Amino acid sequence: MAITFKQVDFTYQPGTPFETKALTDINVTIPTGSYTALIGHTGSGKSTLLQHLNALLKPTSGTVTIGERVITPTTSNKDLKRLRQHVGIVFQFPESQLFEETVAKDIAFGPQNFGASEADALKTAAEMLALVGLDESLLTRSPFDLSGGQMRRVAIAGVLAMQPQVLVLDEPTAGLDPQGRLDMMEMFARLRHERDLTVVLVTHQMDDVANYADNVIVMDRGQIVKTGTPREIFKDPAWLTAHQLGLPKTTAFAHTLQKQGWQFNEWPLTEDELAAAIVQQLPPNAMGEVAAHDE
């Protein structure tokens, strides 16, 4: 499912002394099946744009087309329930939204709210729990007895239980340790392919953008200031610095190496790309000497 913004402006509390313009002339398409990263410094408009992705907010002017549905400033809220089933949002710290007595009931709540029978919803709950890598023995447990990482996966299972076509991830690894963050991001990558999802990732983690995204949207002061592939976005450190953004760690290290004489035809985004570029520049017998030294 594609999402297209056309000449979208959004203003909070229009016509009041507290009027604040948050989005200006947004024109962009998130393609079906893509993995799009949305980046920008705090206050750039990311969260406001995110809430337009399933019409939690409606544009003050312009249109947002979600699949075949066109959202305008006058679209009635009562017509949006089914649409929101198709665009699932995993908000920051989603485990804080858990509330039911058992894991099964919490995951099943969404499907039942959209008309599924209790039996079908509980069956879906078991399937979604397995999908996020948790054992079915947890179904009868209270979600509040689980570890923080397990609680987050249960909350994500609840979003997936709605069978969304678009999965929006708002800082999904916030508060996790490095291994937990890696496991979570690998899970989303797997789900994207297994469920044929369109994924939108809102993050401050440039490494995750480099490793997982196909497309990047950069926001600043309520406007889209650049779009492109991760390689296109991260090729200009000075531009990123001017917009209060950083580089992936691997790319930053490559820039340091360049100052010491190393050459790169294109900036590496991943550790594997960096390693390959370094090996190409080593003397012909260097790797053999390293192997002999290790022995």
From Swiss-Prot:
Keywords, comma-separated and alphabetical: ATP-binding, Cell membrane, Membrane, Nucleotide-binding, Translocase, Transport
Q: Which cysteines are joined by disulfide bonds?
A: none
Q: How does it sit in the membrane?
A: Peripheral membrane protein
Documented EC number(s)? 7.-.-.-
Q: Where does this one sit in the cell?
A: Cell membrane
Q: A single GO CC term, please?
A: ATP-binding cassette (ABC) transporter complex
What molecular function terms (GO) are annotated for this protein? ATP binding; ATP hydrolysis activity; ATPase-coupled transmembrane transporter activity
In which domain of life is the source organism classified? Answer: Bacteria
Provide the residue positions that the database annotates as binding ATP. 40-47
The record, for Pfam families, names: ABC_tran (PF00005)
Annotated InterPro entries = AAA+_ATPase, ABC_transporter-like_ATP-bd, ABC_transporter-like_CS, ABC_transpr_CbiO/EcfA_su, ECF_ABC_transporter_ATP-bd, EcfA2, P-loop_NTPase
Q: Tell me the ranges covered by the ABC transporter domain, including all copies.
A: 3-246
Q: Is Translocase one of the keywords?
A: yes
Main subcellular location of this protein, as a coarse class: membrane
User: What does this gene product do?
Assistant: ATP-binding (A) component of a common energy-coupling factor (ECF) ABC-transporter complex. Unlike classic ABC transporters this ECF transporter provides the energy necessary to transport a number of different substrates.
The text of the family note is:
Belongs to the ABC transporter superfamily. Energy-coupling factor EcfA family.
How does this polypeptide assemble, per the annotation? Forms a stable energy-coupling factor (ECF) transporter complex composed of 2 membrane-embedded substrate-binding proteins (S component), 2 ATP-binding proteins (A component) and 2 transmembrane proteins (T component).
Q: NCBIfam families given for it? A: ECF_ATPase_2, PRK13634.1
Q: Which PANTHER family match?
A: ENERGY-COUPLING FACTOR TRANSPORTER ATP-BINDING PROTEIN ECFA2 (PTHR43553:SF27), HEAVY METAL TRANSPORTER (PTHR43553)
Q: What is this protein called?
A: Energy-coupling factor transporter ATP-binding protein EcfA2
- Annotated organism of origin: Lactiplantibacillus plantarum (strain ATCC BAA-793 / NCIMB 8826 / WCFS1)
Q: What is the lineage of its organism?
A: Bacteria, Bacillati, Bacillota, Bacilli, Lactobacillales
- What gene is this protein a product of? ecfA2
